[in-house]
Amino acid sequence: MSCTASYAGMTTPVKDKEGHGIPCLQPIDVVECTYQYFTKSRNKLSLRVGDLIYVLTKGSNGWWDGVLIRHSANNNNNSLILDRGWFPPSFYTVHSKRTTRGA
């Protein structure tokens, strides 16, 4: 199954950092980052204000597992870049529910 994401009014294929299509995700929430957070840890997300994070699980340790989707630097193909990791839930506001869907 391929997947598309609605982002800023556009529906585009979801791709990983190498440009490969990814399976469809089923987030439990979509949140918007309200504070910057930078980390060097490979299993955590660095966040920018306005980033949308698709929440996959809410960990018992206080951190949430999520997927961050951004437009690629090469906007000619209108693809998205995907990054997954843990993030502090105090850095967001609820944006919407499940805007990712299978194609």
UniProtKB/Swiss-Prot annotation:
UniProt-listed InterPro entries: SH3-like_dom_sf, SH3_domain
One BP term from GO: cell division
Gene3D superfamilies reported in the protein's UniProt record: SH3 Domains (2.30.30.40)
Annotated ranges, domain SH3: 26-97
Pfam assignment, any one: SH3_1
SMART domains from the UniProt entry: SH3
Domain of life assignment: Eukaryota
Alphabetically ordered keywords of this record: Cell cycle, Cell division, SH3 domain
Name of the featured protein: Putative truncated guanine nucleotide exchange factor YLL017W
